[in-house]
Amino acid sequence: PEAIEVLTLARQMSELTSGKFDVTFGALSDVWKFDHDQDDSIPSQAQIAARLPLIDYRRLVVDAQAGTAFLQTKGMRAHLGGIGKGYAVDRAVKMMRDAGLKDFSVQAGGDLYVAGKRGDRPWRLGIADPRAANGSIFARIELSDSTFSTSGDYERAFVKDGVRYHHILDPRTGAPAGLGQPAWPWAVAVLARGGALADGLSTAAMVAGPRAAAALRRRASNRFTGDSTQRLLAYASVRWLCA
């Protein structure tokens, strides 16, 4: 049931973002190597082009009632990077709530949910400068009963010949989001009620870039009307985009 649930959410997020987040980007997972197999190699345009026809979330068919999911084209792959950790946070939060806990935090990678208070004060989170060598904090926020999700080009990345390559791939081009575009944000942060929502939107906003991110935020707000915490702020000093 959990597999079908998270695939359903991933399919919905793909549709919501018009493919900026695309659950079928897994077709590129062995072309670019940013995980345990990272070797700083750059795939050829021919290698990337051969995989692009295999990326299309509309060809993932999920039948929640029957408990089935399948990809309509041979060679396609579903990949839960960009939403899976957020979903895991949501599940953990539900377990904590069901256990009667009111004040707690749950974190999985760049996805953090905080509930209630930390002792006698609100939860305070520091936002790190993604280019600072010492991990210095450039902004702080207070929040409760919300998920804070970050996506950026500073982890699972490498620099080669002065160009930064990172693991957040644009499903439309098969290349790292914003590659070669100096005005692209270094990182994106999304504040939302749900972890899967925040995780998927931060990934999509990183792919969409600064101009299109506002439209994503409006679209999500219209669809998730109960999620009033979403907001868009720009921190130009370190090129963070907070949604």
What residue ranges belong to the model's regions?
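Mature catalytic core of soluble alpha/beta enzymes
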Residues: 1-243
